[in-house]
Amino acid sequence: MLNSVIKRSALCRFKFTCLQVSECRPAQIEISKRLYSAKASGNGEYDLCVIGGGPGGYVAAIRGAQLGLKTICVEKRGTLGGTCLNVGCIPSKALLNNSHIYHTVKHDTKRRGIDVSGVSVNLSQMMKAKDDSVKSLTSGIEYLFKKNKVEYAKGTGSFIDPQTLSVKGIDGAADQTIKAKNFIIATGSEVKPFPGVTIDEKKIVSSTGALSLSEVPKKMTVLGGGIIGLEMGSVWSRLGAEVTVVEFLPAVGGPMDADISKALSRIISKQGIKFKTSTKLLSAKVNGDSVEVEIENMKNNKRETYQTDVLLVAIGRVPYTEGLGLDKLGISMDKSNRVIMDSEYRTNIPHIRVIGDATLGPMLAHKAEDEGIAAVEYIAKGQGHVNYNCIPAVMYTHPEVAWVGITEQKAKESGIKYRIGTFPFSANSRAKTNMDADGLVKVIVDAETDRLLGVHMIGPMAGELIGEATLALEYGASAEDVARVCHAHPTLSEATKEAMMAAWCGKSIHF
Ligand SMILES: Cc1cc2nc3c(=O)[nH]c(=O)nc-3n(C[C@H](O)[C@H](O)[C@H](O)COP(=O)(O)OP(=O)(O)OC[C@H]3O[C@@H](n4cnc5c(N)ncnc54)[C@H](O)[C@@H]3O)c2cc1C
Ligand SMILES: NC(=O)c1ccc[n+]([C@@H]2O[C@H](COP(=O)([O-])OP(=O)(O)OC[C@H]3O[C@@H](n4cnc5c(N)ncnc54)[C@H](O)[C@@H]3O)[C@@H](O)[C@H]2O)c1
């Protein structure tokens, strides 16, 4: 315990030297020098031009203006917020939430002592509620731009030369030419196509079409058992569709820990979604009112052809930089078309930086936002912070899946000596009283130091619970550190505490 306390206070001091303003004077002198050199010199010239108004771009623009940079943000969609707010995180979560409420009220009230009848879906109202949430959040960003004095150019940006961007106006906005001392490319990503399959957004849809279907399909096939496939598959399954997920790999859930993926398949299968893993799509074509799908099981080479009402293609996303003129400037990209950057988000043309889905790393909105803040802090102050070992991920199925840090497989591959602690939600009192106790928390710690390496969970509100684990990992905490923190009772967060106890001393209290 004493060791742990000493270790903890040493860590705190280390963090505070970086974070407490009063102790950062030398850095601040450097900051003002940098800010001066980042400032624009003439009229019509900007300190910062951000291309793309998604979570990466709009956050970078707001923070840039807050740090005193004359900032303009160029967006071609017509609304701010990018993929996330318009056709990603926000509309999907609105549908996930309301479809979950519908499903619970329809199928999970009797055992709770509530009698309901006549429950039905009003899909157009559910879509309207989703659209209203999107609208209020996207227009909120316009308000934040005004409040922070960020200029907003509605149009498509394309580099003329490394200092100049031409903007082709949309929605009646005039064309313009922007000169800036610094640029940030935040142009995001687009759907990865499946060769030979044409997305029409009606019968063969991407996530965008799957967010706006006008009726509940009887049968839906989802190609790809990753985050989009399982989130959107859950929405339509809860609303009544027969959903089959076709996944190339032997397991669903993409990069998540194998134990959690197993639990996820078990729980989601019970909800009625069918999985065809180790299976590849051979062809898909629209045939009248349905889609004819041909698949092959790669374990036994068995082929199957069947009709489905809707096919959702969700096999990943690829960076989007079309029409930006990056080739002309000679900006380096990797094999997957991600714009290459250094640790300060600079491309090989240093005053042009890149963040978010357009560059390396996980394609997540919070990662894009944090990079946006760090990139402008590098411009204005010469220092920024994103800890890539500590970016949480959440899958908003029910129950939710959330993780941060490394998986057990990764620990094995890296040759790290580790210990595991687990705790099931079925032994957590709040989960029991909520009658929603499927899932577990799994903690991976360094066997020698007890320091956290990864935390993985599937369970109720896992997306909220992962915040504590993320903070602990960021500050280099040990499992003992978290286990000794007082957690309120009865809360779901006690499951995290108990998994930490199991990892630290081999035993939890309630399991
Ligand atoms: C269905 C779905 C659900 C998702 N759910 C989540 C979630 O729950 N949590 C999460 O963390 N992530 C989620 N994501 C991922 C998340 O949306 C992205 O990681 C995030 O939007 C990336 O932000 P970004 O700013 O890099 O790019 P984007 O949000 O894609 O924004 C880029 C913007 O740049 C604009 N643009 C492109 N080229 C130009 C140009 N030449 N000129 C002007 N403008 C241009 C585009 O119009 C776009 O608005 C989801 C994605 C999808 C598809
Ligand atoms: N909650 C969230 O944070 C959230 C929600 C949605 C999307 N996103 C982000 O959007 C991005 C795209 O999501 P996604 O679900 O499309 O991608 P993904 O990478 O999460 O999953 C794609 C899945 O498709 C499978 N696959 C690939 N090719 C295939 C093929 N030919 N046949 C069958 N299966 C195939 C992969 O093995 C993988 O399981 C992700 O990077 C994700 O981070 C995040």
From Swiss-Prot:
Binds 1 FAD per subunit. This is Dihydrolipoyl dehydrogenase, mitochondrial. It catalyses: N(6)-[(R)-dihydrolipoyl]-L-lysyl-[protein] + NAD(+) = N(6)-[(R)-lipoyl]-L-lysyl-[protein] + NADH + H(+). It comes from Schizosaccharomyces pombe (strain 972 / ATCC 24843). The keyword Oxidoreductase applies. Its EC number is 1.8.1.4. The active site is a redox-active disulfide bond. It is found in: Mitochondrion matrix. Disulfide bonds join 84-89. PROSITE patterns: PYRIDINE_REDOX_1. Keywords: Disulfide bond, FAD, Flavoprotein, Mitochondrion, NAD, Oxidoreductase, Redox-active center, Transit peptide. GO terms for biological process: 2-oxoglutarate metabolic process; aerobic respiration; glycine decarboxylation via glycine cleavage system; pyruvate decarboxylation to acetyl-CoA; pyruvate metabolic process. InterPro entries: Class-I_Pyr_Nuc-Dis_Oxidored, FAD/NAD-bd_sf, FAD/NAD-binding_dom, FAD/NAD-linked_Rdtase_dimer_sf, Lipoamide_DH, Pyr_nuc-diS_OxRdtase, Pyr_nucl-diS_OxRdtase_dimer, Pyr_OxRdtase_I_AS.
